[in-house]
Swiss-Prot record:
The keyword Glycosyltransferase applies. The gene is otsA. GO terms for cellular component: cytosol. Homotetramer. This is Trehalose-6-phosphate synthase. Residues 1-14 have a biased composition (Polar residues). Residues 1-20 are annotated as: Disordered. GO terms for biological process: trehalose biosynthetic process. One of its GO terms (molecular function) is alpha,alpha-trehalose-phosphate synthase (UDP-forming) activity. It comes from Mycolicibacterium gilvum (strain PYR-GCK) (Mycobacterium gilvum (strain PYR-GCK)). Disulfide bonds: none annotated.
Length: 503
C-alpha cells in the first residue's frame, strides 16, 4: 500500500556497493525506493519510500541479485562533487542514483512528463503543453537512465523499465546493450490513437517503446492502441486478434525483432493490508475516527492525490446536490476527503486546489453547523496506519476519477474490509473497474449517475453489501501485486512464438 504520509523508515544501513558489482535483474524507474535527505549539518540520510511497486519488486531484487536505478528525489548541480552516482547497498538491494539538476526536474519531470505526457495520456482533461526544449531535456535524461542501466546490468540480464517518464529508455538501452532482455510497463493509461497522434514526437515515443522485448499496459485497450500506432506510424507488421489479460499477447514485427505486447493489471499487497486491518489497534483507531466525526450514521470517504484526473470536484458536487435535494441528511452523514499534496508548483494544480477548497467552504457554509462540518477536508500527507483505519471506518468509498490507469485505492479499501462491510462507488474510467465489477460503477461525467450510485451505496441492504464485498475481496485477494510482477516477468522470459496471423 502506498504510504500517503511520505514518512518512510529512516535507515542508516546505506553504504556504497562494490564498483565491480553487476546485476542480473535491474529495475529502472524515475524514483529510487529511498529518498535522499540532506541534513542541516551537510550530511545525508536515506528515507525509505514505501509503495506498491517497491513492495512487489523488493523480494525479486533480493532473490535475483538485483539493482534499482532511479533519482534520489533531490535536485543537484551536475558539477557538485558530492553528487555521487556510485551504487548504494540498502537492505540487500543495490541502488544506483541518477542525478537530476533543478533544470532537469523543471523540464524533464514537471515539464514534459507531467505537463505534456500526463494530460495527453489522461484524455486531455487539461490541455497538454508542447515545448521543444522540454522534449530535448526528456531525451537527454532518458539517455542518462539508459546509460546507467547499461553500466549496471550483467551480461544477458533482465531489465524492467517503469512508466511514462522513461519511454525512450528501451530503445536507447537496446542500442547500448543488445544482449539484454528488456521489459517496459506503463502505469498510467495509454491514450486513444486519435489523441496520441497530437504528440509532435509521436514516432519517437513508439520507437522508444519498441526497444523492449515486452511492452505492458494495465488493460487490453491500451495494448490495442499501441499495436495500431506501431502499424500506422512505423509501418510495422502486427498481430491480429484481441489482446487478453495476462494472456493472448499481441506482437509487433519491427525490423528484425519481434516485440510482445500485453495487458497486466497491477494490484496491491492485499494479504498484508487484510492483516493490518484486522489488528486491534486499527479497529480501535477506526472507532476513534467515527467518534471524532460525531458518530454519524454514515461516513463517506475519498482518498486521492490532489490531481485534476481524480474527479474530486465531481464527488463534492454530487455530495452537495444530494444534500440540497434532501436525499442525504446532513445530521447523520459526513464526507471525509483526504487529499495528498501533489505537484504544488504547477499552476493548474494550484488553481485546482483553490477551486476544491472553495467547494468545501460552500458545502460546509450551506449544510454544516458550528462544531459539526458535514464535509471534512485534509490537504496533507496521511500516515499509513491512519489510512487503513479510515478504510475500516468508512461506510462508502468514493473513487471517481475522470481517467485512471488502475486506481489502487479502490483495491486497498476492499482489502481492508474483512468484515464484508462498506460499499465501493467506482468510476467506469479506472482500470480497476474492469476487475471490480461488483462495485457501484458510475460515469463521472454524468453527475446524476454519480449521485444515484452514492445514494444506492448508502442505502444498500446488509445482505446486498456482503454479497458485493465478498465478490470484490475474492478478486483483490487472488490477484495481488506479487502475481502481477510474476505474470509480467514470466511473459518477458518466455520466448514462445505467438500463433496469430499478422497484418
Amino acid at each position: 500500500m502506498t504510504d500517503q504520509s511520505g514518512n518512510g523508515v529512516r535507515s542508516g544501513s546505506a553504504s556504497e556497493a562494490p564498483p565491480s558489482a553487476k546485476a542480473d535483474f535491474v529495475v529502472v524507474a524515475n524514483r529510487l525506493p529511498i529518498d535522499q535527505v540532506n541534513l542541516p549539518d551537510g550530511s545525508t540520510e536515506w528515507k525509505r519510500s514505501p509503495g506498491g511497486l517497491v513492495t512487489a519488486l523488493e523480494p525479486l531484487l533480493r532473490r535475483r541479485h538485483g539493482a534499482w536505478i532511479g533519482w534520489p528525489g533531490v535536485p543537484e548541480d551536475a558539477d557538485d562533487p558530492d553528487a555521487s552516482t556510485e551504487p548504494i547497498e540498502q537492505d540487500g538491494m543495490t541502488l544506483v542514483p541518477v542525478r537530476l539538476s533543478a533544470a532537469d526536474v523543471a523540464k524533464y519531470y514537471e515539464g514534459f512528463s507531467n505537463a505534456t505526457l500526463w494530460p495527453l495520456y489522461h484524455d486531455v482533461i487539461v490541455k497538454p503543453t508542447y515545448h521543444r526544449e522540454w522534449w530535448e531535456r526528456y531525451v537527454e535524461v532518458n539517455r542518462r537512465f539508459a546509460e546507467a542501466a547499461a553500466r549496471t546490468a550483467a551480461e544477458g540480464a533482465t531489465v524492467w523499465v517503469q512508466d511514462y517518464q522513461l519511454q525512450l529508455v528501451p530503445k536507447m538501452l537496446r542500442m547500448l546493450r543488445p544482449d539484454l532482455t528488456i521489459g517496459f510497463f506503463l502505469h498510467i493509461p495509454f491514450p486513444p490513437v486519435e489523441l496520441f497522434l497530437q504528440m509532435p514526437w509521436r514516432t519517437e515515443i513508439i520507437e522508444g517503446l519498441l526497444g523492449a522485448d515486452l511492452v505492458g499496459f494495465h488493460l487490453p485497450g491500451g495494448a490495442q492502441n499501441f499495436l495500431i500506432l506501431a502499424r500506422r506510424l512505423l509501418g510495422a507488421v502486427t498481430s491480429r486478434g484481441n489482446v487478453g489479460v495476462r494472456s493472448r499477447f499481441g506482437e509487433v514485427q519491427f525490423g528484425f525483432r519481434k516485440v510482445k505486447v500485453g495487458a497486466f493489471p497491477i494490484s496491491i499487497d492485499s494479504a498484508e493490508l487484510d492483516q493490518h486491518a484486522r489488528t486491534r489497534a486499527t479497529r480501535q483507531r477506526a472507532k476513534e475516527i467515527r467518534a471524532e466525526l460525531g458518530n454519524p450514521r454514515k461516513v463517506l470517504l475519498g482518498v486521492d492525490r490532489l490531481d485534476y484526473t481524480k474527479g474530486i470536484d465531481v464527488r463534492l458536487r454530487a455530495f452537495s446536490e444530494l444534500l440540497e435535494e434532501g436525499r442525504i441528511d446532513p445530521e447523520d452523514t459526513v464526507l471525509v476527503q483526504l487529499a495528498t499534496p501533489s505537484r504544488e508548483r504547477v499552476q493548474s494544480y494550484i488553481e485546482m486546489r483553490e477551486d476544491i477548497e472553495r467547494q468545501v467552504g460552500h458545502v460546509n457554509g450551506e449544510f454544516g453547523k458550528v462544531g459539526h462540518p458535514v464535509l471534512h477536508y485534509l490537504h496533507r500527507p496521511i500516515p499509513r496506519e491512519d489510512l487503513v483505519a479510515f478504510f475500516v471506518a468508512a461506510d462508502v468509498m468514493l473513487v471517481t476519477p475522470l481517467r485512471d490507469g488502475m486506481n489502487l485505492v479502490a483495491k486497498e479499501y476492499v482489502a481492508c474490509r474483512h468484515d464484508l462491510g462498506g460499499a465501493l462507488v467506482l468510476s467506469e474510467f479506472t482500470g480497476a473497474a474492469a476487475e471490480l465489477r461488483q462495485a457501484y460503477l458510475t460515469n463521472p461525467h454524468h453527475l446524476e449517475g454519480v449521485k444515484d450510485a452514492i445514494e444506492a451505496a448508502l442505502n444498500q441492504s446488509p445482505e446486498e453489501g456482503r454479497r458485493r464485498m465478498r465478490a470484490l475481496r475474492r478478486q483483490v485477494l487472488a490477484h495481488d501485486v506479487d502475481r502481477w510482477a510474476r505474470s509480467f516477468l514470466d511473459a518477458l522470459a518466455s520466448r514462445e512464438p505467438i500463433n496469430e496471423e499478422s497484418h
